[in-house]
C-alpha cells in the first residue's frame, strides 16, 4: 500500500469514527424538542436501521429509508420524553474500508435512566456499513444486537454528594 493509499484509508477511518461519534452524541441528548435534521444528515437516503436478535428485533424492528428512520427517532422527541440520562460508550472498534464503502463494528455500553423511574444497563453489538457520497461518509446500514440488558435498582444519576478526601488532613 502506497503512502497516499494509506493516508486515504486513515482519513476514511477518521471520518467514519467521527460520524459514529456524532451519532452517539446526538442519541445521548435525544429528547423533547430535539431537531432530527443533524441526526438524519448522518444517514444515506436509502439507509436501513434495524434491531437484530430475539430482543432487539422485537423491540426496535427494521426501518428502511430516511423517512422511516426519522419517524422512529421522532418517538423519542415527544413529551414527556423517554430518557432522563442516556449515555453511549463505544469500544472494541473495528473499521474496514474498501473504496467508497466500509464496514465497522463496535461494542456499546449504555447506562440509562428513564422518565418512568426505571434504570437499565444495556450492552449491544453494533455492525454498521458506511458509504461515501459527495466526499462524506454516511451510515448505510445500522444494526444493533443486544448482548445483555439489566435493570438497575437505583438511578445512575444519584443526587448524593460525591465523596472526596478531607482537605484538612
Say what each PLM segment does.
Residues 1-9, 58-68, 162-164:
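Short, charge-rich amphipathic segments
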Amino acid at each position: 500500500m502506497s503512502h497516499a493509499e494509506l493516508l486515504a484509508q486513515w482519513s476514511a477511518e477518521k471520518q467514519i469514527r467521527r460520524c459514529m461519534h456524532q451519532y452517539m452524541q446526538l442519541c445521548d441528548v435525544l429528547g423533547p424538542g430535539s431537531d432530527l435534521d443533524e441526526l438524519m444528515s448522518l444517514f444515506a437516503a436509502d439507509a436501513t436501521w434495524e434491531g437484530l436478535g430475539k430482543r432487539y428485533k422485537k423491540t426496535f424492528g427494521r426501518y428502511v429509508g430516511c423517512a422511516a428512520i426519522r419517524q422512529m427517532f421522532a418517538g423519542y422527541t415527544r413529551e414527556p420524553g423517554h430518557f432522563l440520562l442516556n449515555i453511549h460508550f463505544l469500544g472494541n472498534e473495528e473499521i474496514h474500508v474498501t473504496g467508497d464503502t466500509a464496514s465497522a463494528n463496535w461494542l456499546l455500553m449504555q447506562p440509562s435512566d428513564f422518565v418512568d423511574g426505571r434504570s437499565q444497563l444495556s450492552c449491544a453489538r453494533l455492525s454498521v456499513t458506511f458509504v461515501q457520497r459527495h466526499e462524506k461518509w454516511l451510515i448505510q446500514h445500522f444494526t444493533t444486537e443486544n448482548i445483555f440488558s439489566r435493570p438497575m435498582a437505583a438511578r445512575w444519576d444519584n443526587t448524593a454528594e460525591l465523596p472526596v478526601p478531607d482537605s484538612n488532613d
